[in-house]
Amino acid sequence: MGGLTPLGMGEASGSVTPLLKEDGEAFKIAVLIPTINNADELDIVLGRLAKQTYSDFEVIISDSKSKDHTKDVCEKYGATWIEDPSRNRADACNYALRQMDHELVLFTDDDTVPPLDWVEKLVRWFDNPEVGAVGGPNFAPDDDPFGAKCADVAFCTKFMTAGTRYGAQPKGELVPITHN
């Protein structure tokens, strides 16, 4: 296992100690990305994942029969490519999950640019045995159109979230929220 190593780009920048289970073994972690016909934006996402501060993870791409060069992009970065028969995001994720044996799975989209410490900041929460899931908002970058920023105001609150194109990291720390 290990972070992505894109061809010709060197090693992932990760130097963070892997998250360990009680037996001292590292958790088997994956980032799962469903996609269909979005190779160029997927290339951007995988490029960012290749530079994560936490590098002990695998990337799984669940591809719903793309007709573009998605598989080539996956090969470029060493991501595992799964051809799935579905035509929607939920089914693509579920199809891939049934084929995976990872203990922690992080989800993102093929048009979301994760911050360079995204994996590290999500994985660290699982050091607490009471944490079962982690999530957060997906903010539009500063240079996105005004309409995307309006969507942030409407959807990216602590009450509900909805992804906007090319999410960027908000300022501040993740905040644990508990539910009964």
Per-segment meaning from a language model:
Residues 2-48:
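N-proximal low-complexity "stem/linker" segments adjacent to membrane-targeting elements
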Residues 40-43, 68-75, 117:
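Acidic helix N-cap motif at the loop->helix transition within catalytic regions
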Residues 47-56:
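Short, acidic, metal-binding catalytic loop of nucleotide-sugar glycosyltransferases
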Residues 48, 63-71, 112:
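A conserved acidic beta->alpha catalytic loop
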Residues 84-100:
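Glycine-rich, basic loop-to-helix element that forms the pyrophosphate-binding segment
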Residues 105:
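Short aromatic/hydrophobic "clamp" motif used to bind/position activated sugar donors
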Residues 116-149:
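Conserved donor NDP-sugar-binding/catalytic core segment of glycosyltransferases
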Residues 140, 161-180:
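A recurrent flexible, glycine/aromatic-enriched loop bordering the glycosyltransferase active site
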